[in-house]
Amino acid sequence: METHFHEWQKSLQLIQQKSEELQREQIQLKSFERELRIINKWFYYGLHYEQKLQLARHPKRPTSLDYIEGMSQDWIELHGDRKGSDDQALITGIAQVEDETIVFLAHQKGRNTKENLQRNFGMPSPGGYRKALRIMNHANKFGLPLVTLIDTPGAWAGVEAEKEGQAHAIATCLQTMFSLEVPMISVIIGEGGSGGALAIGVSNWMMMLEHAVYTVATPEACAAILWKDASKSAEAAEALKIGAEDLLALGVIDEIIPEPIGCAHQDAASMTKRLKQKILRRLKQLKILSGKQLRAHRAERFRHLGYYVE
């Protein structure tokens, strides 16, 4: 690069110096970005269970609809349980994802306070599970693969839900999912809480996002039951083994999907692309099996949960 300039070249010299300055800054910026990626990766490695729970409940974490709409060319939501209810906490529908026509069942939290009130914070009522049951049977009738996205603190436990038969609605979903003869994949994208999560989680392949949680009861509820003190939720979370790594080691889930640096809410587009690739890959493998083989595979998978030898 030229270093000697005549007087009439001064303006060119200034531009060249500015260019060199910007290049140095660009190099520094790239170096800083590399360091930031390393720090971010280290920062989110080995989080405590309570911290994972906070990430799973992050208000900006992508919802089921964010993923479905991001993955599909056209999403058609199917409404109602045909018994007078259309629960907004559990959405159902059909979508075209590349070459696959997929039926989705998904918990849906709100993206803001108003939506959360409409969707009951992602806690389905019996009508929601009856709607899911209706759509499951549609998927089975037409031979369409079923994908469920799980993100709920649990099924709604209010008095009205009990009056409407919450336990029966969940039990019927569980029974039906074991009988379906189509490929079934479940993905825990945020909170997987109690029977409310399990009700749409009987599948051939269970995946879980890196910072999602899956538990028999919320840590707060567990602490209140065991120690009569909800403030001991951190100890309860530790005892429940709610994180993806422990659940993979225990055989409760089959695969962990890594999240982008800084978690899913920092790069929803990248997370959606990753989730889509995983779902399509697993569906391709499951579609090789016959209906009877899929049923047997599902039953065998659940029979081995909690299995141990003394």
From Swiss-Prot:
Residues 31-285 form the CoA carboxyltransferase C-terminal domain. Pfam families: ACCA (PF03255). Pathway: Lipid metabolism; malonyl-CoA biosynthesis; malonyl-CoA from acetyl-CoA: step 1/1. PROSITE patterns: COA_CT_CTER (PS50989). Disulfide bonds: none annotated. SUPFAM superfamilies: ClpP/crotonase. Acetyl-CoA carboxylase is a heterohexamer composed of biotin carboxyl carrier protein (accB), biotin carboxylase (accC) and two subunits each of ACCase subunit alpha (accA) and ACCase subunit beta (accD). Component of the acetyl coenzyme A carboxylase (ACC) complex. First, biotin carboxylase catalyzes the carboxylation of biotin on its carrier protein (BCCP) and then the CO(2) group is transferred by the carboxyltransferase to acetyl-CoA to form malonyl-CoA. This is Acetyl-coenzyme A carboxylase carboxyl transferase subunit alpha. The gene is accA.
